Amino acid sequence: MGNLFSRRDCENRDMCVQYNLLPLVIGSDATTFIKKNKIILSILYKHKIQIQSIQNNHEIYFWCPVGFTNKHFETKWITGKCPFVQLILPDGYYFAADARHIQTYYLFDKYDNMIFTISVRICGYDNFSYSFVDNSDSEYTEPSCHHKNSARIKIFQDSYEIIGMSVLESFFMNYIVEEFYDEIDNFD
């Protein structure tokens, strides 16, 4: 069974790579979104990477990584706010999946410098609400599913230098980024 679960986690991660998805903290309004994602948005801007929102009509499907059924579900964004954005990458920029870590993928620039390490754990049943979802609906019932979604981003030193931060500032900012991504981890 471990292989089945690993395969599903890997397929979910590969979906993020295929569609150029980057997890961000989604707030109730634009001010919250910008405030909590300022560092990441600054790095994307300096690299001339554009973002676009993901709507309900995107055909993105995810598995429940701990479920036993053999089907995936179309994501319907319960809250109307997906905690991912789709990146429009400049020529030469790309995402790559980690060969050893099934939940990890990377964003590289055109010189193969790593910009972000991204780690995600996704459950298709939760529809990315990052809040408690009533699991009693027969369509989405999985006895072993606990909707443990999480997302983390590690920002590399070179990316901080691009936006003019010192090593000390970059250490402090990396702590802030990890802190607000821990916030996502706390939603089950």
UniProtKB/Swiss-Prot annotation:
The UniProt keywords, alphabetically, are: Lipoprotein, Myristate
Highest taxon, organism lineage: Viruses
Please give the sites of covalent lipid attachment annotated as N-myristoyl glycine. 2
Name-wise, this protein is Uncharacterized protein L732
What are the top taxonomic ranks of the organism? Viruses, Varidnaviria, Bamfordvirae, Nucleocytoviricota, Megaviricetes
